[in-house]
Amino acid sequence: MLIRIPAGGDCHESEVTPEAIYRSRRRFIQGAALAGAAVGVPLLARAAEQYPGVPASPAPPWFVGKLGDARWRAVVAQGEAITPYADATQYNNFYEFGPNKGDPARYAAELKVEPWTVLVDGEVEKPGRYSLDDLFTEGQLEERIYRLRCVEAWSMVIPWLGFPLADLVQMVRPLSAAKFVRFETAYRPDEMRGTRSSFALIDWPYVEGLRMDEAMHPLSLLAVGMYGRVLPNQNGAPLRLVVPWKYGFKSIKSIVRISFVREQPRTTWQSMAPEEYGFYANVNPQVSHPRWSQARERRLPGSLFSPNVRDTLLFNGYADQVADLYASMDLTKDY
């Protein structure tokens, strides 16, 4: 589905990125009709023109094949500068690799992401173990530039590549009894050193969940790439969820299981500290974390003398698109 964020989130692509990159992208788009005939390295090179300076990385054949008809800039973010690739890939929360922001970039290469399968089960007509090629055979790869707001009060703007979550839901045909979708991260102690730590408080594997209407919302994305490339391991390769109106911990990484369930799943952070992390985790500047305010955020990159602090927007700036999902709820209680 082609989504265009209206006035609250739309802009011309030249407003989101430096002119040199913008012009390079326009040259790419003008030649897109020929891209479908290219395969392998030439096609990756064309995709790389989207973001000059981003290091090349190997990509599986199914991903390369999807680049030919990718829908670039399907969603943009008004007046926002894209976070530099180095910041987006070197400052991460991914506790399976360690508690520090640099641990995922340092250790995530130990995770083997090829081959990769996802178990789909629960209240669904087409359960099974699917490869990523199976899941996205019919889908068109889309680039979506989303704001990412961490519950720790920092934020980024990231150009994701992926497929609408709703497409997968419709493909596997959940039964009417399914009211929620439960997601599970890989648990591989031999490859994820953070899970071997005796100091880790998390009951692995990491679990997240959405209501069915949230999963079906057009903004919900299953990401397989970013910055014109395949997802780096530290950012959740090879498959992660992106729900831009929720705090970042809802956007679960390295997904190996998607279950359609009757009851609201007990999610990881909710289980660990329910008074601090609710199931919904919608970005809300009026509902503070018990230990800090959520009214403002630090947009990365920043520095000691230029911290780049700004006001946080309700639903991370996507209120026009998602507020109706919660019209009957008290957002100060259902957080």
Feature locations, PLM:
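Generic detector of low-complexity/intrinsically disordered segments
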Residues: 4, 8, 36, 45-46, ...
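Short, cationic motifs built from Arg/Lys/His that form the positively charged side of catalytic pockets
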Residues: 25-26, 240
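N-terminal export signals
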Residues: 27-50
